[in-house]
């Protein structure tokens, strides 16, 4: 899975889109460069016994391995993210009552809320464990990666209306990687493009945040993240939409167990420590060991 760094922590929020304000993030994070593919889900199912179902896209261009994973509910996307974490030794992002292989397990089951007694509890976001490496992007994380441009306004930074670095609608295409293009305005039967062929990039070099398939946000409709059964945000539009639905003005909400051929998702993560940080930590550790031995 390829990630792009999203920097410029503490950027100002946008006050022209939906919701208002949106897009201000006070920390560095990474955004998946591409949407999650069918192949990624199938491999995780085989190894992790996740039981995530994908919609049959035969009537929408086919079930190619590199097509986006569609028909995945928010709850199933959260299961996939948890598997990414636990399979690599990290803390799961989301809390479920039952795990794969246990009696009572269902990939469609709602999460439960992390409690103050749980390591990694974050009162500002009771959905996500702060010790997890991988997670679904929050509303602000998704919005920033799509619409914010640190070089806009003479380097001051600012927001575009579309996730291709422009206030003008992108050129509608069936696929490709040309700048200023997006996969939208296509016949329904065509279906989405492969995840690596899903149009031009955002200012942060992320592909397909406008068109191709709608993407789940981590964040619930009222932005609070304290109700497991509440509707979650989706945004970005799909291959058959008009350009307006790709814009920063549009955010819609669906039940977390909803599965639809138009819905997919991408993954975000925390960055690995930089070499400079690791060198600093190593130097501090060496100094402390020398101090204890002296």
Kindly give the residue locations of the regions a language model identified.
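A short glycine-rich, aromatic-capped structural motif
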Residues: 1-55, 68-85, 211
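Residue-level detector of conserved, well-ordered beta-strand and adjacent loop positions
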Residues: 7, 14, 32, 63, ...
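Short, conserved phosphate/pyrophosphate- and ester-handling motifs at nucleotide-, phospho-/glycolipid
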Residues: 37, 138, 272
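Functional-site microenvironments in short loops/helix caps that host divalent-cation chemistry
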Residues: 76-247
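Short proline/glycine-enriched turn/loop segments at secondary-structure junctions
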Residues: 223-224, 252-259
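A short, hydrophobic C-terminal helix/tail in secreted or cell-surface proteins
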Residues: 272-289
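Short, charged juxtamembrane terminal tails flanking transmembrane helices
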Residues: 291-294
């Amino acid at each position: 899975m390829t990630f792009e760094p999203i920097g410029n922590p503490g950027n100002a929020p946008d006050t022209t889109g939906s919701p208002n304000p949106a897009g201000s993030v006070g920390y560095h994070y990474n955004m998946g460069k591409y949407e999650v593919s069918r192949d990624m889900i199938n491999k995780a199912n085989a190894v992790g016994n996740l039981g995530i179902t994908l919609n049959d896209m035969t009537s929408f261009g086919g079930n190619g391995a590199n097509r986006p994973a569609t028909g995945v509910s928010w709850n199933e996307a959260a299961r996939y993210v948890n598997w990414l974490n636990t399979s690599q030794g990290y803390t799961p992002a989301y809390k479920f009552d039952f795990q794969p292989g246990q009696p009572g397990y269902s990939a469609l089951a709602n999460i439960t809320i992390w409690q103050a007694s749980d390591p990694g509890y974050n009162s500002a976001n009771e959905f996500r464990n702060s010790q997890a490496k991988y997670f679904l992007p929050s509303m602000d994380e998704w919005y920033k990666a799509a619409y914010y441009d640190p070089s806009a306004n003479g380097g001051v930074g600012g927001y575009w209306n579309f996730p291709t670095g422009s206030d003008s609608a992108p050129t509608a295409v069936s696929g490709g990687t040309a700048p200023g293009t997006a996969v939208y305005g296509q016949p329904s039967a065509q279906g989405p493009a492969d995840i690596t062929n899903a149009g031009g990039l955002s200012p942060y070099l992320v592909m397909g945040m406008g068109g191709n398939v709608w993407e789940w946000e981590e964040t619930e409709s009222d932005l609070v993240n304290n109700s497991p059964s509440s509707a979650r945000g989706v945004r970005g539009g799909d291959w058959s939409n008009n350009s307006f639905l790709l814009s920063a003005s549009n955010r819609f909400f669906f039940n977390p167990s909803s599965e639809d051929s138009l819905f997919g998702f991408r993954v975000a993560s925390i960055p690995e420590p930089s070499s400079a940080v690791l060198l600093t930590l190593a130097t501090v550790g060496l100094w402390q060991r020398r101090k204890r031995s002296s």
